[in-house]
Amino acid sequence: MLKKSLLSKECRETSLAGVHHVVMRGFNYERVFNDEQDRRKFLEILRQITHPMDENGTPLPPYCTIYAYCLMTNHIHILLAEGTEQMSDTVERISEAYINYYDNRYERQNPLFTERLHSRIVDNVGYFLIALRYIHQNPVKAGIVKSPSLFQWSSFREYDGSIDTDCICSHTLPFAHMGKKDVCELVVSVSKKRKHKKRTQRTRSKLL
């Protein structure tokens, strides 16, 4: 069972600094990923952002810390904390790197992402938990999979142990008392509640 201390009022209102929920949307809601290669390239860029190195292969301080991500077909969710640069500069860095790859591969020049950056400041633990849960539940809500663990292109697989090498996310969350197992329980509990609600609705409809 998820620790009650995580959901207490005091914990939910704990202030966080420099954390943002970023959504990178495709221009005119068009797709930004066409196949597995595109998605793997984007994840490679995220690794370079969170684990940068100089020309000699010496590790550098991260541009940002990523706590969650989800690669949908026409948009991307990222939950991040600012590192050596501001959030907008980091997102621009990610965007430019992926656009260069995408344009070269498909020989195109049209806009790929919307010019306006969609982001919300995550200023307390309560909203952090909501964002963490929402991002990992995105493929389930979209009807792509029945469980977050079945979606290949989100950070949930890092938290549940399906991926244990070349991880992008920091699993040390910006507050105490919550580990990877707690994150999985928090996210999956929503799926269970949704399934229960659907079963209840179907039962009621049969009775009417």
Predicted regions and their residues:
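Short Pro-Cys-Gly-centered "Cys-loop" motif that presents a nucleophilic cysteine in a tight turn
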Residues: 1-68, 72-73, 81-208
